[in-house]
Amino acid sequence: DRATRLVDQLLTLSRLDSLAQLDDVQQVAIADLLQSAVMEMYHPAQQSGIELRLHLNASHIVRTGQPLLLSLLVRNLLDNVVRYSPCCSQVDITLNAREFRVRDNGPGINPQALSRIGERFYRPPGQEAPGSGLGLSIGRRIASLHGMQVDFANARDGGFEARVYW
């Protein structure tokens, strides 16, 4: 339920904030990580009328990190796009040599709200879908712990895009 999810997110964020470095790191194949997340989110996406499309332009990318945290980063991005994209949207998840992107073909986000996306507890005005405003900030913190950065933007030809790069 919603309260349990909020408590889980707060605990996750608290744990991530206390980390100065990662322990128990290993080599993680980013293509495998993206494929697993797409498979996990496939059914919820279908229920919302959203098509997930995976494009592996660079399939042998490996990063050092904690697999569970990196998986959480990707799941949070996909959960966000499935939760907030309008019905009948297409979502492209694209892996390139130095980045991966999650992009929908919806209306994008108001420019004033866009500058605050990823802040803790921030939700754009008028948002009807349930959420806490923590998922993207958790993702941003996980990326930072792994030497990555996350940017959020409106795509040039429409839609919202999250870009994770290293």
Predicted features and spans:
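Conserved catalytic submotifs in the C-terminal HATPase_c
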Residues: 26-27, 46, 51-61
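Short conserved segment of the HATPase_c
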Residues: 109-121
